[in-house]
Structure formats: C-alpha cells, structure tokens
Amino acid sequence: MDIYENGAYDVQQELKIAYGNRLDLQIEICSITHRKALEKVFEKYQPHIIINAAAHKHVPLMEHNCVEAIYNNVFGTQNLVELCEEYGAERFMMVSTDKAVNPTNVMGATKRMCEMIVQSASTHGKVKYSATRFGNVLGSAGSVIPLFKRQIANGGPVTVTDKRIIRYFMTIPEASQLVLQSGAIANNGELFVLDMGQPVKIMDLAENMIRLSGVQGIEIVETGLRPGEKLYEKLLVKTEELDKTDNSMIFIERDNALSKEEIYKKIDVLRDACDTGDDLIAKEALRSVVPTFKRPEDVNKEIA
C-alpha cells in the first residue's frame, strides 16, 4: 500500500520481473491519514502483519509544513494502531529514525511521537508492537548519494551544508533485513536500535564520490545548515545503556511507555493545534508534547 502511485507501480513492476506468475500481489493506493479508506483496506485484507514505513521525512520541507507532517506521521500512525486493534492484527512494526533521538526538527519530533504512540499501545493492546530506529539508507529516494551523483553529472558544484556534518549510513538490503528481524523477535513494546557502525563525514563522502567518478574540476560548496538540521545524529548505540538481543546488530533501548490516557491527551493537543492550520502553532504544540524536542542552534552550539 502506498499513497504515491508511481512508487507503487515501480515496486509492482520490479516484483513482477523477479517472480513472474508466482507473484500474488495486490496494490492499494491509500493514505494512512484517510481513516475511512484505510479501514476499507483492513476490512478487505484482514492483515496479520503491518509495517509502517509511511513518513514525510525531508527535514527542511517539514520545518515549513508542520501541520502536514503531524497529520501524516503522527495521526497516520495512530490510525494504523487503532485499526490493528480493531481488526485483530498480530504484529505492528514501525520504521523510525535516528532523528527521533533528542530531535531538533519537526520530522524527528513527529517520529519520536510515533514511537511514544507505539510503546503506549503495547501497554493495553492485543497486538505485538515494536519500533526500529536507524539512520540514513544509502541510495534511497531523496538521500544524499543520488543528489551527489546528479550534481557530479551536471559538472558540479557538489553542495554540502556543513563540512562538519556526520551521518550514519546503511544499505537498503541491510536496513530491510534488520527491520524485519527486529519485528520478528519483538515480544511487545520494544524500541529497537540498530548498530549502524561508524558514522561517515558527508564531506568525505562527497570527495570520494567525485574521485571515483573520474570527473575533474568538481567543486564542493558549503551552503550552510538547513532549518532543523543537526551536525551529528545520535543513535544511542552504547551497549551499557541498551539490552542485547541474539542479533549483535540489534539492541533494545530502555524506555518507559506512557499510559493510554497520557498519549491521547498529547494527540488531542496536536489535533487542536493542527485544526488552526498554522504551522507555527502546530510546531509549538509538538514541542510541548515531545519533551526532548530541542532547538537545533542549542544542540549544535553544544557540539560545535
């Protein structure tokens, strides 16, 4: 299921090529914010396992579209959680992000709120809930590598917001497999953290891609940090602070779940703010319900 028909079509064609007549695949075009349509999908298929990878994820865009980010990321997740309970799903797995750790932007704060919703549901629901948090996926839509490739192909310059920026990366197969493995081993309510290995300097990545391309004279230009952007992301992979699993790359963060009443109060605050249609009001409401939501300038000042 996808809201974006072109993406759904591409996946459909890729799977048809790979599996041919053996493929039993149904495609549904639906937004998780459209409760009635989503309910029809649940009624039709009675799904056992739901993996929620739906998210507005572009940090600078979401800084100026806070209402839409909350509707899609937060209210959409809440719709899925409620329908999982109503239709007797077995497992719900949510894909989260390192940007949810002490978030400095709307995207990260909405994903932190999603984690709180999932963990709260695990305290009173029948479904086995889990969330898996990891960093950037190499080559995924909208990620930095396709951008650098286009910029190099166009003769440059390659743009880097700040030469100090460091990010965690994982390949698409690694990310997919670890998300599935996390969901499979979940008992209920876990917040899984993946060991992403050593972080990479974006400046080094840009220099290496230029060198490997063989193109001469490509300039790298610093453009300045974008709204909501951190210099460093933090995954919290500190083994002394996490519980181990049988998979050496998957850990469980210790966190306290909110009650059903507490989480619904937070959702009501966000709904009231979003009903105004004002992104600034929505952002302040988000800041009030996600205690760890910090201003990026404060965080970057600490680590600069």
Language model features with spans:
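SDR active-site strand-loop-helix element
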Residues: M1, I50-A54, F92-T97, T132-F134
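NAD(P)H-binding glycine-rich loop region in Rossmannoid oxidoreductase-like domains
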Residues: K16, I32-Y71
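Hydrophobic/aromatic anchor residues within beta-strands of the central parallel beta-sheet
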Residues: I27, A69, F92, Y129-T132, ...
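Conserved residues in the N-terminal Rossmann fold of short-chain dehydrogenase/reductase
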Residues: E28-I29, Y71, D162, E222
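Conserved sequence/active-site signature of Rossmann-fold short-chain dehydrogenase/reductase
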Residues: T33, A100, V137-G139
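Conserved Rossmann-fold NAD(P)-dependent oxidoreductase catalytic core, especially the SDR/UDP-sugar
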Residues: H58-V59, H64-E115, S120-S122
